[in-house]
Amino acid sequence: MKMLDKTLPLEELESSLTKTESKAYYLSKLVYRHDKVVNNKAHILQRKLLNLKKQLFYGLTSYQKLCVARHKRRPTTLDYIEYLLDSWIELHGDRRGSDDPAIITGIGRIGRRSVVVLGQQKGRNTKENVLRNFGMSSPGGYRKALRVMEHANKFKLPILTFIDTPGALAGVSAEKSGQAEAIATNLKKMFSFEVPIISTIIGEGGSGGALGICIGNYVMMFENSIYTVATPEACSSILWKDSTKAADAAEALKVRAEDLLTLKIIDEIIPEPFGVAHDYPLLMVRILKNKIRDQLDFFDTFSPSELKHHRYLKFRKLGLYYDC
């Protein structure tokens, strides 16, 4: 089997592999119990295809990682909540007349623990994306998230946040409603909470929109997620007045998990099964659940004041710089 030509568009390569993988699976089912030789060959083909998939998603450029993070089949916050929690109830509204569908909030249980969960939610299709503002939260969304987090702090419940947004909602209505103030208030309040906050970047982590719910004691990031001060397209338009330079901007912004771990912006990279979460969502959930449980166990030993101080010190030490 030939090596992959990574000069081709990522979507084209993945589509070709997926079609071949489906044909191999169909072939193995078709000949099952009828022709062992052909059946064995089909299994060999499937293994080779799996290796090619690993190869495809290994060593991606920053912009290719961005494409994977935006994949239409990539699991969303709701997908993870549904399978991570043994039971949960969604909570609505910011108590100021708004209930932003771009942010999901709720309370549930992982094993014997009660937890509060929240995260940005993208749609699966155009209609859903319009409803959820493509995962871009309004000021009401951040206030809803804050209301639920304050509930968690009051009742001493751990907070789990999931980040997947290109950024906060930009527009006249959002600015009139106090977008900057809503995000700033979240940042301030999250530093004051005396419960563990575990944040996971599952897709796009864009700008202040991501940071507004990402002040965590522990910040994890999926292998093919991105975390950035601005989208590469926006950055290239601002710096070079040319949106076609988005790939160059992505490299300069250091959006990849590997770069961010080196720069000490995040605490851990969560590997995606066989290189990609959207083809193996249930396996991805199991991996994430174990990681979250480990961190909940770790922070169980901290007192409320220690949790608050730990978060403060973490962000005081954030980042890495070099003297020129």
Swiss-Prot record:
The keyword Ribosomal protein does not apply. It holds the Pfam family ACCA. It is found in: Plastid, Chloroplast. One of its GO terms (biological process) is fatty acid biosynthetic process. PROSITE patterns: COA_CT_CTER. One of its GO terms (cellular component) is chloroplast. Its EC number is 2.1.3.15. It catalyses: N(6)-carboxybiotinyl-L-lysyl-[protein] + acetyl-CoA = N(6)-biotinyl-L-lysyl-[protein] + malonyl-CoA. GO terms for molecular function: acetyl-CoA carboxylase activity; ATP binding; carboxyl- or carbamoyltransferase activity. Residues 44-298 form the CoA carboxyltransferase C-terminal domain. Its main location: plastid. It is an enzyme of class 2 (transferase). SUPFAM superfamilies: ClpP/crotonase (SSF52096). Keywords: ATP-binding, Chloroplast, Fatty acid biosynthesis, Fatty acid metabolism, Lipid biosynthesis, Lipid metabolism, Nucleotide-binding, Plastid, Transferase. Pathway: Lipid metabolism; malonyl-CoA biosynthesis; malonyl-CoA from acetyl-CoA: step 1/1. Acetyl-CoA carboxylase is a heterohexamer composed of biotin carboxyl carrier protein (accB), biotin carboxylase (accC) and two subunits each of ACCase subunit alpha (accA) and ACCase subunit beta (accD). Belongs to the AccA family. Component of the acetyl coenzyme A carboxylase (ACC) complex. First, biotin carboxylase catalyzes the carboxylation of biotin on its carrier protein (BCCP) and then the CO(2) group is transferred by the carboxyltransferase to acetyl-CoA to form malonyl-CoA. This is Acetyl-coenzyme A carboxylase carboxyl transferase subunit alpha. The gene is accA.
